[in-house]
Amino acid sequence: MSRPAATLVLRNAVVATCDRGPSDAGLLPGAAVAVEGRRVAWVGRERDVEAEVNLAGAQVIDARGGLVTPGLVDSHTHLVFAGERAGEFALRCAGRTYLQVALSGGGIAVTTRETRAAPDEQLLAAAAARARRLIAQGVTTLEVKSGYGLDAPEELRLLRIVHQLGRALGGDATILPTLLFHAVPPEQVGDRAGFVRDACASLIPQVARERLAQFCDVFVEDGAFAPDEARLLLQAAKDRGLVPRVHAEQLTAGGGARLAAELGCSSADHLEELDDAGIAALAQARVVAGLLPLSTLFLGSERYAPARRLLEAGVPVSLATNMNPGSAMSENVGLTLSLACLKLRLTPAEALVAFTAGGARALRQPDLGRVARGADADLVLWGCGSPEHLAWHMAVNHALVVVKHGRVVHEAPPAAMVDCR
């Protein structure tokens, strides 16, 4: 059997393969990873790499004892928007709830007005800046939702901007677009049934026909969409080949998780108000539970998703930033990992697996989120030697080198390089 001809090798590493289940990061100390082109060609012991891999012509990175993981998969983001909601943040700091602000004319309505008024170039530039901040922290795959246009023409415009974002990043990250039904447009609040009917008959088929999205997501919540409305939208999307997902049980127990199980959604995200029946439904249907602890922190709540109960019930979990202007205005990967441990009670290994393999599962991307022969060569070298350190040293960017499809797309300055041995 011929040796793989490596184009990139990371040596002297602690490799986390993230392919051994939800609670095992698959740590391999004293290890190396060899990449051939866009794929992982070999993973094994450092002492074997020279005998088993052709290193002639390969770019070699000495990890110096640092942790090498799969590229992070941020499976839930809202990067395309304009404007700010800092004033709303101050109101919530003074005691108003998210729902109270929304019902008084704030919330999504504010972002919708600003986003509709912004030109494409402004929206693209802002989204690209947010994506670049995530890439610099080890994210190599991003799900990006529409949702702030609300009506059909604006939602189509936002999805086209998401596609432009992928091109603007030049292959430095994979962008997976989602059509999000966030709320009924203000122009159609008097005819909710008509809006849903038109979306099923026109918007969703056009999105599918033009291949503008891979997923369709619905916010199932008081003031957004009822389960019966969401069922119609998601079934129409599923019939057209889009993968259904839901925002579920974030602010109230609205039945979104059971709907996700019924429809075979790839994920049900948020879940702060999830009950035992919802957990059982997700477990039986093998729907991924999307954990978004930055949102809970940002909204000033102490009611986090029941992550431990989900894991104990056998529900697969993912971890994501939920970067958005209303409930998680942050791209901080390190803080997300730390909150997963401190508030969701995940172990550091579980948090890392959820942010890699879990995200890949939520997005139905089997070649992502793991370090294994044949998998996509999306890798991160961190300036520490363990998942525990990543979560312990809070809100810090530990990413030293980020690799996408076998190509270094981000590298920290030399002064940031550390020896972890």
Swiss-Prot record:
A Pfam family reported for this protein in Swiss-Prot or TrEMBL: Amidohydro_1
Record-level Gene Ontology MF annotations: imidazolonepropionase activity; iron ion binding; zinc ion binding
Entry annotated with the keyword Metal-binding: yes
Gene3D superfamilies assigned to the protein according to its UniProt record, in alphabetical order: Metal-dependent hydrolases (3.20.20.140), Urease, subunit C, domain 1 (2.30.40.10)
Key words of the record: Cytoplasm, Histidine metabolism, Hydrolase, Iron, Metal-binding, Zinc
Obligatory cofactor(s): Zn(2+); Fe(3+)
Residues bound to N-formimidoyl-L-glutamate: 148, 324, 326
Known catalytic reactions: 4-imidazolone-5-propanoate + H2O = N-formimidoyl-L-glutamate
Record-listed Zn(2+) binding positions: 76, 78, 247
Keyword Magnesium appears in the UniProt entry: no
Positions annotated to bind 4-imidazolone-5-propanoate: 85, 148, 182, 250, 327
InterPro entries given in the database record: Amidohydro-rel, HutI, Metal-dep_hydrolase_composite, Metal_Hydrolase
Subcellular location field: Cytoplasm
Pathway assignment: Amino-acid degradation; L-histidine degradation into L-glutamate; N-formimidoyl-L-glutamate from L-histidine: step 3/3
EC number: 3.5.2.7
GO BP term (any one): L-histidine catabolic process to glutamate and formamide
CC cofactor note: Binds 1 zinc or iron ion per subunit.
Residues that, per the record, bind Fe(3+): 76, 78, 247
Domain of life according to the entry: Bacteria
Task of the protein: Catalyzes the hydrolytic cleavage of the carbon-nitrogen bond in imidazolone-5-propanoate to yield N-formimidoyl-L-glutamate. It is the third step in the universal histidine degradation pathway.
Family: Belongs to the metallo-dependent hydrolases superfamily. HutI family.
Name by which UniProt lists this protein: Imidazolonepropionase
